[in-house]
Amino acid sequence: MKQICLYFEIHQPVHLKRYRFFEIGKDHYYYDDYENERAIRDTADNSYVPALTTLLEMCKQNDNFKCCFSLSGVAIEMLEQYAPEVIDLLQQIAETGKADFLAEPYSHGLASIGSEESFKNEVARLAGRVKELFGVEPK
């Protein structure tokens, strides 16, 4: 019997607001909270929740089923704030024991280019959050 590994990457980029030249030095808040919330809600409603609901059912119904997730720290923060039901579904999937979680740089950035120490710190930071939220050690 052939085996496959289903790997799911969850990341959400942070949207920056329009920042005009004349705002330099006056406005130091760069994030577009409205667009960030809209984007994560849209993605959660149309992608994450339906897919994770299906994966949870598959985990419960099939003894041989396994899947793997990699979440960026940025995505975790946005999901906790704007779409906590996605975190709840991931926790339920983790509780089945049929999901592995991988570690990556917290910000889903290019930390490995800068320095090995920076890369290790980013990965350790995310690994800590995954353990805290889902009760499993990332691999």
Named regions from a protein language model:
Residues 1-138:
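Catalytic alpha-helical scaffold of carbohydrate-active enzymes acting on polysaccharides/glycoconjugates
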